[in-house]
Amino acid sequence: PLCQGLFAQAMGSSGSVMGFKKVATLKEAEEEGVQLAQKIAEKIGKKNGKKVGKKVGMKNLNELRALPAEELMKLAEVRAVPVYNIDGYFMKEQPVEVFAKGEQTKVPLLIGGNNQEMTPLAVLMGKQPTVENLKAGAKATFGEENIDELFRLYGINSDKDVLEQPGVNLASDIFLDYSTWKWGNMHKLTGGQPVY
């Protein structure tokens, strides 16, 4: 890694890049960026290159380009999370593969998390907070065949449970807790250093 030898210990909290899904390739991240740009353009009034920025008071494309990114995202009412990716420079391969081979920086590691790491709204992806909608969102991670047992284990039995602690626990485990555990476990197995 580029940072080899630059630090003596590491601390990680609230997730890692070793969750249920693989890290995006550069091509996939660029495609996602194009989709985001299209959503932004649609929200602020661009249609086939015309009416650019009209809905937000911009006179031309240059004025729109001059907006700070945060303001543009706010005006466009689009929420997005930056996507780390395998760019061939900083990240050359899947982190899980690096750790499986024991090629990570070998330093003591402290990992952790917080209560209520993630809201169920992240799993719902804009849909109403119902058991059925939460199940639909969770199926992408756990599959159709496991969903009823999963909801039984988490105690998600009614729509009320979706936004309360059972739903928070599920969302936190999907997005952060599992990936943090996996990072620590893989480092313990191949890093030759203690994990706390």
Task: Annotate the PLM regions.
Residues 9-16, 33-36, 159-163:
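Short acidic (Asp/Glu) and glycine-rich catalytic loops that position anionic groups and cofactors
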Residues 1-4, 27, 177:
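Conserved structured core elements
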